[in-house]
Amino acid sequence: MNKFVIASLNRKGNLVFVNRYYGGTAKTSENIEDAKIYYSPYDAQEEWKDRMGDAKITLGLKDGNVPFIVSVKQVMAKTI
């Protein structure tokens, strides 16, 4: 199982990691240690299916509050 995080792109173009639903709290954090999600890609995609629709994961989001899924490896390597 890969490590996945739920993240959104804010208006400044920075990633904001969200553990609101998976962590059981309502906080958001830019600290990746607080936002790690141990979920399979399939389960994470199903969870956010209504919000994501059929859109591909992209940084070109119009709404900064729309979440997307990135892997921890991508975040750490800054390849997104």
Regions found by a protein language model. Name each.
Residues M1-N31:
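Short aromatic-glycine-(Arg/Gly/Cys) micro-motifs in beta-strand/loop hairpins
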Residues K36-I80:
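Short, mixed-charge low-complexity intrinsically disordered segments
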